[in-house]
């Protein structure tokens, strides 16, 4: 355990577009003597969206800014948020724990994929959409592999392009949202020209791919791994042989750290004011943890929070005028890509809901709440700590997961001892 806390004027958790925009903006507008410390699990900045050094012009502009001399970066994981001060308990890859303190703390913890379990979803070869994209970017060979993408949300399209670029055989791109919902979404796109042009760019590349709407996965099957997927549009069903099925129902905000910090949560996202300030003093939340709205919104929030942390309050308020427009886009995405009821109705008694602990739907269904299910079945007690099964249990049974408790990642007993020793020294 490192004895002295690591101190910086601004402490940022996360390293995606929102975090990068906040760090770079702070570094440019704060006094040169003030330092910004960015903490992230990944070895490089960019988050999932800018993984592996995106060549996108917008991404390059912000990523280049991370080389400013008053921005420092540490790789590792945040184990806990300090209750009284803007700070966290941090563990480096070598296992060393340390207190990191800032005058202000910014949480930019992003979002994760939402899964709705279906028969066969735990078979090898069935992956999350973002998971498949990440694996392709880090070397998975899908050349000549038959790929079905079926789920919901804008993430489907960059994933499909990743499969195309990797020479995979993209058989199907199926969206579960209804035609009526998608028509309403399209009607609102002119208010977001940057998103409209992005969508047109994907459609120009994907127009040859079969892309039904109002279509979803009923089940997946195979001997030992995925061999086929059964699709339906509610009127008829059909099977397709494939090697990979990438699926997921839009994204959900990562709010565990914010909840642990005592921030107000509203509609399953962190509640913030116009400058990104949470209900807790000197603690900001930006990006997808405040609502899933894409990189442009995340960057806009990061700029506003970075200016506020740098003491440029007037300029920060001026920049925040753009945010209500993006808040409406978040609401539009949520309304369009929410899971249809049929996805919840098709689950069977033997369908696994908690894959860490191998718990089927039939064992969870009689339980009255998350805590009872946890005590009786070990729901949410595996390595993911409810990150996958928690949202599924909420959708299926209306369970509200327990208040999160540190640590947020599996730890050795020694690391756990060091974490609490660090907290006690700082309290």
Task: Give a label for each model feature.
Residues 3-65, 149-150, 154-194, 387:
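Beta1-alpha1 glycine-rich phosphate/pyrophosphate-binding loop at the start
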Residues 16-17, 44, 113, 153-155, ...:
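Residue-level detector of alpha-helix initiation sites
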Residues 128-136, 244-293:
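FAD-site-proximal beta/loop scaffold in flavoenzymes
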Residues 66-90, 100, 166-256, 264-266:
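A Rossmann-like FAD-binding core segment of flavoenzymes
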Residues 349-364, 377-395:
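Local cysteine-cluster metal-coordination motifs and their immediate loop/turn environment
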């Amino acid at each position: 355990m490192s004895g002295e806390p690591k101190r910086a004027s601004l402490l940022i958790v996360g390293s995606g577009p929102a975090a990068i925009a906040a760090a770079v903006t702070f570094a440019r507008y704060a006094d040169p003597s003030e330092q910004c410390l960015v903490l992230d699990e990944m070895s490089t900045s960019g988050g999932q969206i800018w993984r592996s050094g995106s060549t996108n012009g917008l991404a390059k502009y912000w990523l280049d800014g991370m080389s400013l001399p008053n921005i420092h970066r540490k790789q590792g994981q945040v184990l806990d948020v300090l209750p009284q001060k803007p700070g966290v308990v941090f563990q480096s890859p070598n296992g060393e724990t340390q207190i990191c303190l800032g005058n202000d703390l910014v949480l930019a913890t992003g979002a994760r994929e939402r899964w709705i379990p279906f028969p066969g979803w735990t078979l090898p070869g069935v992956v999350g959409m973002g998971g498949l994209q990440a694996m392709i970017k880090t070397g998975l060979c899908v050349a000549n592999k038959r790929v079905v993408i079926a789920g919901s949300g804008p993430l489907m399209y960059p994933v499909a392009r990743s499969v195309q670029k990797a020479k995979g055989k993209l058989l199907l791109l199926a969206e579960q949202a209804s035609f009526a919902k998608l028509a309403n979404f399209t009607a609102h796109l002119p208010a977001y020209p940057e998103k409209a042009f992005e969508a047109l760019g994907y459609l120009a590349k994907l127009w040859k791919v079969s892309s039904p709407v109002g279509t979803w996965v009923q089940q997946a099957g195979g001997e030992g791994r995925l061999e086929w997927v059964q699709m339906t549009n509610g009127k008829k069903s059909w099977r397709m042989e494939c090697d990979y099925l990438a699926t997921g129902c839009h994204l959900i905000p990562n709010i565990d750290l914010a909840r642990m910090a005592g921030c107000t949560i509203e509609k399953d996202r962190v509640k913030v004011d116009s400058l990104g300030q949470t209900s807790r003093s000197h603690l900001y939340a930006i990006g997808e943890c405040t609502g899933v709205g894409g990189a442009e919104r995340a960057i806009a929030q990061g700029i506003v929070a970075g200016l506020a942390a740098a003491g440029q309050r007037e300029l920060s308020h001026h920049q925040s005028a753009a945010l209500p427009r993006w808040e409406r886009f978040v609401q539009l995405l949520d309304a369009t890509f929410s899971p249809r009821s049929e996805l919840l109705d098709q689950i069977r008694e033997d369908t696994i809901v908690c894959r860490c602990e191998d718990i089927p739907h039939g064992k969870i269904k009689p339980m009255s709440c998350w805590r009872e299910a946890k005590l009786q079945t070990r729901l949410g007690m595996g390595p993911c700590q409810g990150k996958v099964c928690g949202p599924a249990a909420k959708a299926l049974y209306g369970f509200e997961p327990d208040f999160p408790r540190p640590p947020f990642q599996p730890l050795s007993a020694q690391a756990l001892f060091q974490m609490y020793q660090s907290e006690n020294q700082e309290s």
